[in-house]
Swiss-Prot record:
4'-phosphopantetheine is transferred from CoA to a specific serine of apo-ACP by AcpS. This modification is essential for activity because fatty acids are bound in thioester linkage to the sulfhydryl of the prosthetic group. It comes from Phocaeicola vulgatus (strain ATCC 8482 / DSM 1447 / JCM 5826 / CCUG 4940 / NBRC 14291 / NCTC 11154). Signal peptide: none annotated. This is Acyl carrier protein. The gene is acpP. PANTHER family: ACYL CARRIER PROTEIN, CARRIER DOMAIN-CONTAINING PROTEIN.
Length: 78
């Protein structure tokens, strides 16, 4: 697992209060991890803060799984 993936996973565990074992690449924030729309917005904000990036709303809407988040951040992190 990459450093970015590990950091993303840690943020999700912290913010959603889920078990680390539940946070898989394929896990959907809403369907698998129980996030609501506010939780998802807060996750995006945490990713922006943690990685020093800005995620436009149109891109944030496409980030629905742990893998989506990791891929986006890996492609856009400074």
């Amino acid at each position: 697992m990459s450093e970015i993936a590990s950091r993303v996973k840690a943020i999700i565990v912290d913010k959603l209060g889920v078990e680390e074992s539940e946070v898989t690449t394929e896990a959907s924030f809403t369907n698998d991890l129980g996030a609501d729309s506010l939780d998802t917005v807060e996750l995006i904000m945490e990713f922006e803060k943690e990685f020093g990036i800005s995620i436009p709303d149109d891109q944030a809407e496409k980030i629905g799984t742990v893998g989506d988040a990791v891929s986006y951040i890996e492609a856009n992190a400074k």
